[in-house]
Design a protein with these regions (language model features):
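C-terminal "cap" of GNAT-fold acetyltransferases
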Residues: 114-134, 140-158
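Conserved acyl-CoA
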Residues: 99-115
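A short helix-loop-beta-strand connector motif used in the catalytic cores of GNAT acetyltransferases and
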Residues: 42-60, 81
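Conserved beta-strand in the GNAT
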Residues: 60, 66-74, 81-86
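A conserved beta-turn-beta hairpin within the catalytic core of GNAT-like acetyltransferases
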Residues: 74-83, 92, 113-114, 146-150
């Protein structure tokens, strides 16, 4: 079940960030020196609270009472920015990520968005293919100085 998150849910949300992104941080060699917050795998609570307070729409995917997935999105000028879709490693490959993405698409349409945009580690071929299989296309790249990866920019027309 997907439900909107309140400020009191943020500690559980942070757990999903830390454990969900840890596999990515390890796979791509993300450290505090080459990538802020290790690509969100060590995101501090104050940054998550700041995102919540600045209007990021946050949703949790629950298996029973446990938050096992997260969706963060922002609306601006007819475009939905997909900040994060995270599923805990032990719950992956069960359709939870797809459910979160489909939910994001519905919410974006309801709010008048014509597109969803995101940035991701382009070397993460499995994730890139997943987004492509779900209607996203590559629209460019960005290389950040000192980062051990290139960001692939993707978008999906709704």
């Amino acid at each position: 079940m997907i439900k909107p998150l309140s400020k009191s849910d943020l500690p559980d949300c942070l757990n999903v960030f830390h454990h969900g992104y840890e596999t990515v941080a390890v796979e791509f060699g993300l450290t505090e020196e080459n990538c802020p917050d290790r690509g969100r795998a060590s995101l501090p609570m104050e940054k998550l609270v700041s995102e919540f307070e600045s209007g990021t729409a946050m949703f949790g995917y629950y298996a029973g009472d446990e938050m096992v997935g997260y969706l963060g999105m922002k609306m601006a000028e007819g475009v939905c920015g997909l900040d994060d879709i995270i599923v805990l490693p032990e719950y992956r490959h069960n359709g939870y990520g797809k459910a979160l993405l489909d939910f994001c698409k519905r919410k974006a349409k309801e709010n008048g968005a014509g597109k969803i945009r995101l940035g991701m580690i382009d070397d993460n071929r499995q994730l890139r293919k997943w987004y492509e299989d779900n209607g996203f296309v590559n629209v460019g790249y960005k290389k950040y100085e000192g980062a051990p990866f290139t960001v692939g920019k993707m978008e999906c027309t709704l």
